[in-house]
Structure formats: C-alpha cells, structure tokens
C-alpha cells in the first residue's frame, strides 16, 4: 500500500505541474498538454482504485496491528479521492475556458484572415516558425507550415511514447517493490515456522527438508527478479 501511495503522490505532483502550466498559458497551450493531463487523470484514478481495493482487503481480514493503521490509510484514501475530484473539476474548467477563447478568436477573425490563413490561436503557437518562414529571400515559405506540422506530430508521438514508457517503468518499479515486500514477509514466516516446529518437537531433519524447499523457492524468486530486470533493460533499449 505504501508503494501505491507513493506512486499516487508522483501522479498528483505531475497533475499539479501540468494543470498549472495549462492555466498559465491557457490560450496558447499545446493540445498535447491536454492529452497528457487526461492520461494522467485516468492513471491517477486507477491507482486510487487499486489503493482502495488493498485497503478494503486489509480492513476485512487484517490483524490487530493492521487495524490500528486503518485510520491513516483511510485518511490517505479520502485525501487522494478529493485531490482527483479537484483536479478533474479544474481541468474541465480550463478546457471550457480554452474552447471559449478559441471559438471567440475564430468568430472575430476577419474575412481577409480567413482567406489568407491568417494567424488563429493555433497559429500563435507557431509564431517562431512563421516569423522564420516569412523572412525575405526564404524560398521555402510555402512549405514551412506543413514541415512544421509534421515535426509537431512526430514530437507529439515521441512524447506519448515517452509517457507510456515512464508509466511502464513506474508499474515495474511498483511490482518490484511489492515482490521485495512479499519476500521479506516470507522470510519472517519461515523463521516463525522453524521456531514453531522446534517448539512442537519436530526433528531437525524435517525442518532442514522444509528449509531446502524454501531455498529452492527463493532461487525461483531471484530468477524471476533477474528476468524482470532483463525485460526492463530491453524495453528501455527498444524505445530509446
């Protein structure tokens, strides 16, 4: 649960930064920023749902120590839900404002601008490129905008790919943390079981047999971690 909460905090920080940027440059913010915020909101909601499922399981069948921790986890869950609700409402408000400004800009666009493809809100985002292509002696002015659009699309594809890769890596890190936590639990259970068997008078030979079996399981566990790290390496190598 701690790993999920840390993951949710990272998503929360990302949302705070992106929404603040969208609010600051609402008129000229790129469309890709809205897509990034939408994707992070969906991922944040999914993380909260996973956290809630773990919380419900722990509260339903937890020990006394876990029950004492329930208030802390419940407060975290309530806080995360409130944050998601606030982010979602703020994003909808900014999107509505963006659409209204964009529509107003097109409404008051002069006929001459409409015929010559004058600057709209979208073209303002390409000011630097338009200035370059409109300089005297620049023979590629008729092809500047299509080339820029192609570069923008390619950059947007790379950004989405990097965002998906980061999400995969975060999920892998979360899975690795869960596996390490489960390994620690298994080690504690093994120690408790060995002490219990000795207390019950079970022979050392039987205990050694059990420990050998546990050791084999541990080797399998280490092999799985190794294969996981190799997989992450090849994913990074493939995408980058």
From Swiss-Prot:
UniProt key word Transmembrane helix: yes
Any one of the GO CC terms: Golgi membrane
Primary location recorded for the protein, binned into one broad class: Golgi
Source organism: Candida glabrata (strain ATCC 2001 / BCRC 20586 / JCM 3761 / NBRC 0622 / NRRL Y-65 / CBS 138) (Yeast)
Gene: BOS1
A GO biological-process term: vesicle fusion with Golgi apparatus
Protein name (Swiss-Prot/TrEMBL): Protein transport protein BOS1
Cytoplasmic side: 1-218
Residue spans crossing the bilayer: 219-239
């Amino acid at each position: 649960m701690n790993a999920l909460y840390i993951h949710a905090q990272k998503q929360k920080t990302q949302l705070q930064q992106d929404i603040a940027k969208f609010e600051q440059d609402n008129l000229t913010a790129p469309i890709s920023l809205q897509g990034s915020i939408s994707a992070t909101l969906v991922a944040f909601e999914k993380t909260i749902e996973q956290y809630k499922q773990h919380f419900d399981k722990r509260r339903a069948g937890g020990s006394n120590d876990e029950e004492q921790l329930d208030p802390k986890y419940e407060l975290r869950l309530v806080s995360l839900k409130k944050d998601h609700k606030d982010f979602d409402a703020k994003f909808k408000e900014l999107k509505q404002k963006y659409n209204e400004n964009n529509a107003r800009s097109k409404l008051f666009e002069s006929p001459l601008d409409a015929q010559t493809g004058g600057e709209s809100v979208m073209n303002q985002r390409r000011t630097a490129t338009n200035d370059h292509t409109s300089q005297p002696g620049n023979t590629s002015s008729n092809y500047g905008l299509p080339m820029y659009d192609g570069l923008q699309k390619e950059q947007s594809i790379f950004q989405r790919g990097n965002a998906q890769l980061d999400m995969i890596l975060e999920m892998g890190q979360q899975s690795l943390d869960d596996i390490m936590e489960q390994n620690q639990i298994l080690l504690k259970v093994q120690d408790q079981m060995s002490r219990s068997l000795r207390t019950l008078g079970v022979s050392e030979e039987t205990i050694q047999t059990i420990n050998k079996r546990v050791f084999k399981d541990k080797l399998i566990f280490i092999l799985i971690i190794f294969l996981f790290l190799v997989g992450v390496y090849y994913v990074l190598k493939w995408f980058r």
